[in-house]
Amino acid sequence: EDSLSSRFDRKEEGLIDIAVIRYPRISNFTDLSVLEQIGQVSVRYVDSVRDLHHPDMIVLPGSKNTMADLKWMRENGLEALIKKKAQDTIVFGICGGYQMLGETICDPYQVENGGSMKGMGLLPAATELKQEKTRTQVTGTFGEISGALSGLSGKSVRGYEIHMGSTVDSGSNVDNRSTVDGGSIVDSERVINPESRGNEKRYMCRIQNEADGSVKYDGIFSDNVYGTYVHGIFDEGTLAETLVGILAERKGVVLDTGQMISYGQFKQMQYDKLADGVRKSMDMEAVYAMLREAAI
């Protein structure tokens, strides 16, 4: 609880400033942990118009109740301000945040509150909440990204999906059986030649389900606005550093990259520290003896 409190209470703005919308039902906010490890970068959790200021990127994270949290943003003025800032500021939605950025959210099975509501309208996307929950580990690559984050094009992606819903590109005329995300791609030719998919060229990532090998397109982007269902999307390799580099170049500032390490390296260092602590606190010879005895 102390770590959550300190994370949410951070107010200082770094050379690169990332504002994460802290709705009442925020979830999976560890998606931004990788960015918190980079020097000169601030990750602030914002729940009011007054505190948003002028960030280099706005992130709409996951939500335990997308429709209720969107209604909360609509009522406190954050939605209107984010829509205004999206004209020249990068806005990135993950999972529930991605659903909010679209044109409509429909809940025919009363997964959340039932009914339907208008989205923020920043992405040509329509979401239908489903009764079945998607849970899967995925790997893949970014597609041909345009706009401010074009530097992510072709980069490797690794993460996971956990959501109730399917989102389609409402601006395309493609059969919804081949959803942008939320379902396996029916026509393998479309995987090989994504450029033949018309408006579906807006997809963020081409990802593969690590469990069954199925492939699909995930996410949508338009102008400065990007959305995806993939949690941990910035964790792979040096992707977070690439993102921060893009933000720095866009802002016209230079970061000290000498101290940067990949998030994978950072996590391994933490695991090593944990292992060292366990070894110092336990009689490891006794543990090994029990393991040897159990193996007999």
Language-model segment annotations:
Residues Y45-M57, N65-N76:
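Glycine-rich phosphate/ribose-binding loops and adjacent secondary-structure elements
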Residues M57, D88-F92, G114, S222, ...:
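Short, flexible coil/turn micro-motifs enriched in small/turn-prone residues
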Residues S63-G159, S166:
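Cysteine-nucleophile active-site neighborhood
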Residues E1-R44, V49-D56, L122, A126-T127, ...:
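C-terminal lobe/tail of nucleotide-utilizing enzymes
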Residues V174-D175, V180-D181, V186-D187:
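Long tandem-repeat architecture
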